[in-house]
Amino acid sequence: MDNKIIVALDYETEAEALNFVDQVDPSLCRLKVGKEMFTTLGTHFVKQLQDRKFDVFLDLKYHDIPNTVARAVRSAADLGVWMVDLHACGGLRMMETAKQILEPYGKDAPLLIGVTVLTSMEDLDLLQIGINASPMEQVIRLAHLCQRAGLDGVVCSPQEVEVLRTHCGKDFKLVTPGIRPEGSDFGDQRRVMTPKQAIEIGSDYLVIGRPITQAADPLAVLKSINQSIA
């Protein structure tokens, strides 16, 4: 079974994170390790998650010169992560170099995903960094660039999923943050949708954090979400 739920681990300590992880089941979700936890806890923490049979999405959003990003992606592959991402605005050459370095790994290579427009960003945010386009227009532009580079898919908000399916086809993976079960606080993300809605319009993987990690019974919430999208 291809788990569609990716739980974002946003904890301050290893003990807190592992306490949560030990309450959930790798058959029900994958786990995302971001910049804060990876900077604090490093590869040892990732290996602890893998030892518990969880697939890991290493969410470090690489953005640097091509060789530096490629070597970082290779290190992620050597670590055995399931998915790794980079910023599409790093350009075509950066993404192509990262994809090429994964070729020797074959079927064991992690999924390589492009980050398009962060879900916290709106039209004004883009304009302030010199991009005179809507989030939708910029996502489409960057998704095309990712596809041209040979990436496996992109991170995009739920509102862009249907358009990207049309532009990029059914085999291009769409990883969707901004997912909040009904009744949840939207937090710092503005372009949001429920799990059921996102799957129905074609999302492949749903990134969900606090509604699961801060729940009194995270396993029950996880089971409920999985049931809603079954």
Curated annotation (Swiss-Prot):
Query: Does the UniProt entry include the keyword Oxidoreductase?
Result: no
Q: Which reaction does it catalyse?
A: orotidine 5'-phosphate + H(+) = UMP + CO2
Q: Could you give one GO CC term from the UniProt record?
A: cytosol
Q: What EC number(s) does the entry state?
A: 4.1.1.23
Q: Which residues bind substrate?
A: 10, 32, 59-68, 119, 180, 189, 209-210
Q: Where is the active site?
A: 61
The coiled-coil segments of this chain are: none
* Record-given protein name: Orotidine 5'-phosphate decarboxylase
**What species was this sequence derived from?**
Glaesserella parasuis serovar 5 (strain SH0165)
Q: The organism's lineage? A: Bacteria, Pseudomonadati, Pseudomonadota, Gammaproteobacteria, Pasteurellales
